[in-house]
Design a protein with these regions (language model features):
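Periplasmic peptidoglycan-binding/tethering modules of Gram-negative envelope proteins
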Residues: 1-50, 124
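Periplasmic OmpA-like peptidoglycan-binding domain that tethers envelope proteins to the cell wall
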Residues: 27-33, 54-124
């Protein structure tokens, strides 16, 4: 099915596509392409819409590495969107490392996986 956005898309609105990454990986898993394609469709329909791709990591490992990895994850998503015809000028990226966890946890591997994620935020 197609993703339909029923909420008006205003600056700061966050879209959680449940795109998660393997440990120490910046590679987008193929099962997430359809979710990213819903953003491609949205950006092709809303020609003036700009977004911020936020990369996140779990708390495992050194924060310096987590920030680098979360930046690389955000950039991987930006590059995917560009490969589908979206102008890179419409997409900002930022990596937060482990500073904004979706879930707080005590060393739980399922929750760690949910914190290794991407969020899309409306920028205008």
């Amino acid at each position: 099915g197609e993703t339909v956005f029923r909420t008006p898309l205003k600056k700061g609105y966050s879209i959680d596509l449940s795109i998660e990454f393997e440990i120490n990986s910046k590679t987008i898993r193929s099962q997430h392409y359809s979710r990213l394609n819903s953003i491609v469709k949205l950006l092709k329909f809303e020609k003036k819409l700009k977004i911020i791709v936020e990369g996140h990591s779990d708390k495992l490992g050194a924060e310096k590495i987590n920030i680098k990895l979360s930046n690389e994850r955000a950039l991987a998503v930006k590059n995917y969107l560009i490969s589908k015809g979206i102008s890179g000028e419409r997409i900002k990226t930022i990596g937060y490392g482990s500073s904004k966890p979706a879930f707080n946890y005590e060393n739980n591997s399922n929750i760690n996986a949910k914190n290794r994620r991407i969020q899309i935020v409306i920028d205008n």
